[in-house]
Curated annotation (Swiss-Prot):
The gene is nadK. One of its GO terms (molecular function) is ATP binding. It is found in: Cytoplasm. Its EC number is 2.7.1.23. The keyword Transmembrane helix does not apply. It is an enzyme of class 2 (transferase). This is NAD kinase. Involved in the regulation of the intracellular balance of NAD and NADP, and is a key enzyme in the biosynthesis of NADP. Catalyzes specifically the phosphorylation on 2'-hydroxyl of the adenosine moiety of NAD to yield NADP. It comes from Tropheryma whipplei (strain Twist).
Length: 301
């Protein structure tokens, strides 16, 4: 059995990282760490758990190329140590594998990660015994066409966005749904979000919160310069096409907050719901409404 561990590289996360590695090794499982953790020298050299794993030959620090090859071999679980950003990076590393993903919260909010550091022993036990539930979340994908040729494919858990590259500039975008133009706007950007991503960038830009099991896609303009450019909620089987009409090329394509590609005027971005779900592992019971109240510190009394 193999466990994939993603580490945010912060000093506060190192003891948790070492403890999880040691717990996993004690149960005769091997550990694969992401390149971000591999490049953290203090994480490699100061944690006794990590050193003993190296000596035992069960802990492998891999470069990106080796990591990609290792992903082809199944993992029993993926564990991130950090905030939502670390969890999303792990999800990208393990995309299309069906690996159950767990997150230990070392961030400020950690909406996607629900394991506290003091619960890591129970977490490893739950993984070993298979005592957890799985939530299957559909990702969003995008294909970029330039001059009639596909130049890039993208994938995200939360959202894919088109944004301005330079402050003070606006982005001109046409939005088509099933071939029908529904928006022609100037804005700071536009968000194509999943139900999972409805509590992230989409929410901060005025989009609605939707329950993660809902099969919908959100189209949310960011600071639009039109009076009636409002968020749209679509069934997840709709075809969404974005066309960049900005006269300059100060536009970028981002996925889950990371810049992936510089766009040009005339580029077309076709967005679809992914076919292979992202599997969220859950060891805690609770409903989504309770999670909202806790994470957003909502005043309910």
């Amino acid at each position: 059995m193999r466990v994939y561990i993603a580490h945010n590289g912060c000093l506060e996360a190192e003891p948790i990282y070492g403890t999880i590695c040691e717990l996993v090794a004690q149960r005769k499982m091997s550990v694969i760490t992401d390149p971000h953790a591999r490049n953290n020298e203090s994480a490699r050299n100061t944690d006794s758990g990590v050193v003993s794993l190296n000596q035992a030959g069960r802990n492998k620090y891999l470069d990106q190329e080796t990591t990609s090859r290792s992903i082809n071999v199944p993992f029993c679980a993926g564990i991130s140590i950090g905030g939502d950003g670390t969890f999303l990076r792990m999800a990208r590393d393990l995309k299309n594998t069906g690996t159950p993903l767990f997150g230990v919260n070392m961030g400020r909010m950690g909406f996607l990660v629900d394991i506290e550091p003091e619960d890591i022993v129970n977490l490893v036990e739950n993984i070993v015994k298979g005592e957890y539930t799985e939530e299957k979340r559909l990702p969003i994908t995008a294909s970029v066409q330039r001059g009639g040729k596909k130049i890039h494919d993208e994938w995200a858990v939360n959202e894919i966005t088109i944004e301005r590259k330079v402050e003070g500039k606006v982005v001109d975008i046409e939005v088509f749904v099933d071939g029908c133009r529904v928006m022609d706007i100037s804005c700071n950007g536009i968000i194509i979000a999943t139900a999972t991503g409805s509590t992230a960038y989409s929410f901060s830009s005025g989009g609605p919160i939707v329950w993660p099991e809902m099969k919908v896609t959100l189209v949310v303009p960011v600071s639009p310069h039109e009076l009636f450019a409002k968020p749209i909620v679509l069934p997840d089987n709709r075809s969404i096409l974005l066309k960049v009409t900005s006269r300059d090329n100060k536009v970028v394509l981002c996925s889950d907050g990371q810049v992936r590609l510089c766009l040009q005027s005339g580029d077309e971005i076709a967005c679809h719901v992914g076919k292979v779900p992202v599997v969220f592992g859950r060891v805690k019971k609770g409903c989504f409404a309770e999670h909202l109240v806790k994470k957003f510190n909502l005043q309910t009394a």
